[in-house]
Amino acid sequence: MIKGVDLSAFQTDIDWDKAHKKIKYAILRATTKNNKPDALFYDRAASCKLYGIPYDVYKYMYATNQADAYEEIKGVLNLLLDVFKDNVSVIYLDVEDDSLRKLGSEKLTNLICYEANMIKEAGFKFGLYTGLSFWNEHNFNHDEVLKLQPIVWAARYPHDNKINCYPIEEDIPVGSLNPNLPNQIGWQYTSKGFVDGIKQKVDLNAFDESILSLHPKELYELFLNDVFNGESISKALESIGFDGSYEYRKKIAAVNGILGYKGTAEQNILMLNLLKAGILIKP
């Protein structure tokens, strides 16, 4: 088993020099309730790439009708397909919201399958996240969803009512406490995790090592050139045989955590300084 975390904008100010030593796999929140990118998604994706941490994404499901379901997954795909498609293998659909319980099994099953098929048709693997209690309540038809061969990531926190903090170095709970749902390879075993370098409490996950086989070994490549010319990022890129256009720089900005790239002087200087330092990531 490998240990990892799932992250959203609720975890701020991560010291990746420290945190990356313990994190073997990360799952990042892709978009918010209004289908906009998580405020720290680009930064997190760039950090994972730089530190060689395999990562996938999750989408918390709010949709109660097909139109909203379409917009939910469209928002995730719009985020991923341009820049991040080569790094993300699994899109986990987070099925746990109380509002979904009220839909009835047939309607919720249809919505899950609709979103899952959008994910698969876009070339990603469908992941299903849910809690043991939500599963046991049969809020959706398990057999129908399992036909889509989801990668299941299940939540159960057997010790959270007894502890204030669960360091990632400590052993996971004994196997008999694992939800062990069909197709499950991941277990979110606490919401009170502690990882050196992350100030806030964080969810901790234990995954079968097979999850790593879905990710390329080379997660990032840097612009490593001894000599480049030009005092602008455009000229510098062109001098080493790369595209200096705005569209290409926008892709570079995204994978390096430079948010809302507009080609401003400040953004371009930052990009140039990363290139000079030998740590500018290629898209």
Describe the residue ranges of each PLM region:
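Catalytic domains of cell-wall/extracellular-matrix polysaccharide-remodeling enzymes
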Residues: 87-168, 173
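Short secondary-structure transition/capping segments
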Residues: 38-41, 68-71, 138-142, 258, ...
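Short, Lys/Arg-enriched alpha-helical microdomains
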Residues: 248-280
